[in-house]
């Protein structure tokens, strides 16, 4: 993406009132993009932290900024990207003209980027180097919920693409709150080696605490540094969340660039 000195980038994260580390990857990606000097301004806002989405309405007061690219740092389309963010940022479609004459451009979430499969494979290789993929099962862990299955659909889509490559003995999507459950990993895998990659944007409570417990990794400390975990005669390799991958900064930049190439569809705000 070429430099856009008359444009700003707003990265929207979920944040957390419980775990301050939840926003760390989003802030880190923003810092890296800012360092590259591609935009006049790069900043973040959050649903559960400060600065809030409403605060963002008062950002970008420089008259030289004509366009604001809004990229949700979310793993999939869903309630927050289709309803909460448009409502809080007062967006009325893919493009919103402000009274200040700025144009706010609402981009697709980072998790829907076409290169997500390669990032997942990269993370899997990093966490289990020199482990033969042909003797390994790869598990992609999504949240899964009865309220909104978009995260589950997104995880399943990635799994189908990775499975089609035929690199691993098996590639499965598993979830925290719906079948197939990550807690059943021992029953649904047959290989000695099992690699687990959380399909989340940050190492929040789910990926740092909940999923390891569901897997049976109960030792304190850095779960990834302790790889492989020897459980029930298996070698279990556990990764940090995919959203902590440094190349996520490139994903966010490319989602902004993609807007001008093909405007995304935005569901009506309810």
Q: Where do the PLM segments sit?
A:
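Active-site-proximal alpha-helix that buttresses catalytic centers in soluble enzyme cores
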Residues: 1-270
